């Protein structure tokens, strides 16, 4: 009986935590025209603004957008860019940027373009050297809807460290499906 009670308590705790996380993610998105959301029932209907503008940004621009928020490791920037791409495809029905394909590497989802750009930095934190110029460039590259997606991704995942984001991506279907048949440390590229 105690075991059943503990399992129910754990289930309720996890359900509550997931509801709060989902609520935070949805409420941080201001690109929705209409939203019916019930916290307890977790039912949601949303009408999303679809963006028909051509993609101007490259995946390295997405990385720069996040780096304006603060210095971070190559691993963390990879994961944030992955989530920006996933959220953009889901909410806007378009890529967040060009060259936005991700592969399931041992340490999570990795974009080959970003990997090539930042490979030489090793474990050093990446940073923006010219903030004003980068900020001006970002204003020209991203639509207001894309900025809302980027802000929502930052608000949801920005506080996590690189290892936490890696662990999170390892629990999600895109990584799991691409890693099917590969050993834990076997290269997929």
PLM features: what roles do these ranges have?
Residues 2-6, 12-15, 26-189:
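Domain-edge interaction signal
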